[in-house]
C-alpha cells in the first residue's frame, strides 16, 4: 500500500512545516517552500495541518499507486495527468491501484505539492518528517526521491466525506494579484 516513484523529477522530497528548535545545533528548519499551497493540499483532504506531502520543483515526478487513496495537487501549474488524461488541481482526486500520475514542466510557479489521505509512512526525525538533504535526515532516507523508490502509506484509505465536492476555484488561489491591507 503506497506509491512507487517511476521518475523522481528534478527535486522531489517529503516535506511538512519543518523542524524548529534545532537551529542552534546546526539543523535548518527545512519544510515546505510554499506554506499556502501546502496547507490547502492538506485542507482539501481533511488531513492534519502539518501532514507530510511530496514537494517537487520545476519538473514533477511520475508516480504509480499500489493501492487506493485520495490525493490533492496544489502549487504551480505542472499540467498533471492521470493515466494520460488531464487531472484537476486544487481538488480531491480518487486514485485507484495501478493509476499513474505524471506531470509536465512548470507552466506557472516553481513548486508543486501532492497530499495523500493515507499519509506517507516516513519517520519523524526531531519532530518533523521533512527532508533535510544537507544533514541527510528526515523524509525518505534523508534525500530526494529517485526512480524506483517506494513509499508506503501509514493508514488504509481513509473515508473522506463528500470528497467529490472538495475543490477550490483556481481563481481563488491566484498568485498574480495579492492585496495586502495596510494601516495608514
What are these regions (language model features)?
Residues 179-184:
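A short, hydrophobic C-terminal helix/tail in secreted or cell-surface proteins
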Amino acid at each position: 500500500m503506497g506509491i512507487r516513484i517511476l521518475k523522481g523529477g528534478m527535486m522531489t522530497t517529503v516535506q511538512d512545516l519543518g523542524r524548529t528548535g534545532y537551529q542552534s545545533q546546526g539543523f535548518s528548519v527545512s519544510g515546505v517552500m510554499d506554506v499556502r499551497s501546502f496547507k490547502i493540499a492538506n485542507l482539501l483532504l481533511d488531513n492534519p495541518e502539518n501532514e507530510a506531502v511530496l514537494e517537487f520543483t520545476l519538473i514533477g515526478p511520475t508516480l504509480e499507486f499500489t493501492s487506493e487513496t485520495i490525493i490533492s495537487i496544489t502549487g504551480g501549474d505542472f499540467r498533471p495527468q492521470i493515466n494520460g488524461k488531464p487531472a484537476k488541481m486544487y481538488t480531491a482526486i480518487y486514485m485507484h491501484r495501478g493509476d499513474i500520475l505524471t506531470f509536465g514542466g512548470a507552466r506557472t510557479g516553481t513548486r508543486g505539492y501532492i497530499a495523500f489521505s493515507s499519509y506517507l509512512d516516513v519517520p519523524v526525525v526531531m519532530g518533523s518528517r521533512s527532508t533535510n538533504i544537507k544533514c541527510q535526515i528526515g523524509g525518505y532516507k534523508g534525500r530526494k526521491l529517485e526512480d524506483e523508490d517506494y513509499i508506503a502509506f501509514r493508514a488504509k484509505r481513509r473515508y473522506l466525506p463528500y470528497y467529490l465536492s472538495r475543490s477550490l476555484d483556481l481563481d481563488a488561489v491566484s498568485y498574480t494579484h495579492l492585496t495586502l491591507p495596510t494601516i495608514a
